[in-house]
């Protein structure tokens, strides 16, 4: 069994916080349910997706793209925020 990635965990947790189904998120993003599930189950890395798709995912889930992609986030100077 594949270990859940940090990104996948964040997606699932945030979706549940918003009380939305995977199908609702997929529809809002404009992708199929199966495509979204690949991200949330960790079979596809969000960071490997196009920037446009990452931004749509983050908008639907009300997430900061930097917090999703970069483990420690980044500040405006481009440095890790937890250094």
Regions found by a protein language model. Give the residues of each.
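A short, Lys/Arg-rich alpha-helix, primarily the initiator
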Residues: 1-17
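Alpha-helical residues within the helix-turn-helix
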Residues: 16, 27, 59
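Short, basic-rich loop-to-helix N-cap that marks the start of a DNA-contacting helix
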Residues: 19, 43-59
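Short alpha-helical DNA-recognition segment
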Residues: 19-41
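Short, charged recognition helix plus adjacent turn
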Residues: 59, 67-83
